[in-house]
């Protein structure tokens, strides 16, 4: 239990209620497929960041709840389509949407979620000045473009073994951090924050998102399958060029590199081959990856500390969430 549990639960429950009311309609199977991943829980980290960022600048809660729901629905849309592209079978401990409902319906479910995200954001922005509405839609739309670019780059990486660290960081700043940045900056924007504070909150989200993805890559090697909610070592099997793989290939001995490369991207790799590869990766890059995540976490806190708002509880809550991001185990 944390000091912030009641605070967080109120936000999560309100956002969940809005999502449930919006992801329903007259075509039951489509809406069932669209709502499927929401039934498995999830951290709701992005709507928490958005709502608390709004609180930080004295924003209206109901408006933030709808904007947070828009962000979470958009995030879920990306998960549905990512699982199709990565051919993943499990997400959050459940069969992925395309596995449970078939590929055509999963694609439609993703499309529906994409549209519903905009519908929710439209509701969130009602009554705001036109300039604020345009800025919010611009941030939201650009985040989708940037995420799509990041996913494409990530897929290209699967066919390369010469990825540099900066290329990886650029990729995750698009694929993952863009939506964190959208969450924190839209939250500040709809609460009336000035341009400099919106920029600082965007920087907070970007750095936090990078730290989050690095930790996610670490957990892909260290968490057990039940905690992770997907098959352990799936990143190795899929050939994902995480920071851990990049650093290992840079530092390991030639015979160790052969072991890693034999398993990397090999859909039929045995459990023993995956474990041997994972052990080598942990040996060379685990500490480095943790330190890198810590660096971006500190960058996020530095940006947060510079905002003009001195609202105590929301500021502390965002710092708590940021720390959770790098200390989490799933």
From Swiss-Prot:
Protein residues bound to isopentenyl diphosphate: 43, 46, 75, 92
Cofactor comment: Binds 2 Mg(2+) ions per subunit.
CDD domains: Trans_IPPS_HT
Pathway: Isoprenoid biosynthesis; geranylgeranyl diphosphate biosynthesis; geranylgeranyl diphosphate from farnesyl diphosphate and isopentenyl diphosphate: step 1/1
Residues that bind Mg(2+) 2: 82, 86
Pfam families: polyprenyl_synt
Keywords annotated in UniProt: Lipid biosynthesis, Lipid metabolism, Magnesium, Metal-binding, Transferase
Binding site for an all-trans-polyprenyl diphosphate: 91, 175-176, 213, 230, 240
Coiled-coil ranges (or none): none
EC number from the UniProt entry: 2.5.1.29
Catalytic activity: isopentenyl diphosphate + (2E,6E)-farnesyl diphosphate = (2E,6E,10E)-geranylgeranyl diphosphate + diphosphate
Residues annotated for Mg(2+) 1 binding in this entry: 82, 86
UniProt GO BP: geranylgeranyl diphosphate biosynthetic process
Top-rank taxon: Archaea
Broad class of enzyme this protein falls into: transferase
Names of required cofactors: Mg(2+)
Temperature-related activity annotation: Thermostable. Most of the activity for GGPP synthase remains even after heating at 60 to 70 degrees Celsius for 100 minutes, although 90% of the enzyme activity is lost on incubation at 90 degrees Celsius for 10 minutes.
Function: Catalyzes the condensation of isopentenyl pyrophosphate with the allylic pyrophosphates to yield geranylgeranyl diphosphate (GGPP) which is a precursor of the ether-linked lipids. It is able to use dimethylallyl diphosphate (DMAPP), geranyl diphosphate (GPP), and (all-E)-geranyl diphosphate (E-FPP) as an allylic substrate.
NCBIfam families xrefs: GGPP_syn (NF041003)
Name of the protein described by the UniProt record: Geranylgeranyl diphosphate synthase
Gene name in the database record: gds
């Amino acid at each position: 239990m944390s000091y912030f549990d009641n605070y967080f639960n109120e936000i999560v429950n309100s956002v969940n209620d809005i999502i449930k009311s919006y992801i329903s309609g007259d075509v039951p199977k489509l809406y069932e497929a669209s709502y499927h991943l929401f039934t498995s829980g999830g951290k709701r980290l992005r709507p928490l960041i958005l709502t608390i960022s709004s609180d930080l600048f004295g924003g209206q809660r109901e408006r933030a709840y709808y904007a947070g729901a828009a962000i979470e629905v958009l995030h879920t849309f990306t998960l549905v389509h990512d699982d199709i592209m990565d051919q993943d079978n499990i997400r959050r401990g459940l069969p992925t949407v395309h596995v449970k409902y078939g590929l055509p319906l999963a694609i439609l479910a993703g499309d529906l979620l994409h549209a519903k995200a905009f519908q929710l954001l439209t509701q969130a922005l009602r009554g705001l000045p036109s300039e604020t509405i345009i800025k919010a839609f611009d941030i939201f739309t650009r985040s989708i473009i940037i995420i799509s670019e990041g996913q494409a780059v990530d897929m290209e990486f699967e066919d390369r073994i010469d990825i540099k660290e900066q290329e990886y960081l650029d990729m995750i700043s698009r694929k993952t951090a863009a939506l964190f940045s959208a969450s924190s900056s839209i939250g500040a924007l709809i609460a009336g924050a000035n341009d400099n504070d919106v920029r600082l909150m965007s920087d907070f989200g970007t750095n936090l998102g990078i730290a989050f993805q690095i930790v996610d890559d670490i957990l892909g090697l260290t968490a057990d399958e039940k905690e992770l909610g997907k098959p352990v070592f799936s990143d190795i099997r899929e050939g994902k060029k995480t920071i851990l793989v990049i650093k290992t290939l840079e530092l390991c001995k030639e015979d160790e590199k052969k072991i890693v490369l034999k398993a990397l991207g090999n859909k039929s790799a045995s459990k023993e081959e995956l474990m041997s590869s994972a052990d080598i990766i942990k040996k060379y890059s685990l500490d480095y990856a943790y330190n890198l995540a810590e660096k971006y976490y500190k960058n996020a806190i530095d940006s947060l500390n510079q905002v003009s708002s001195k609202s105590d509880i929301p500021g502390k809550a965002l710092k708590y969430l940021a720390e959770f991001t790098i200390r989490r185990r799933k």
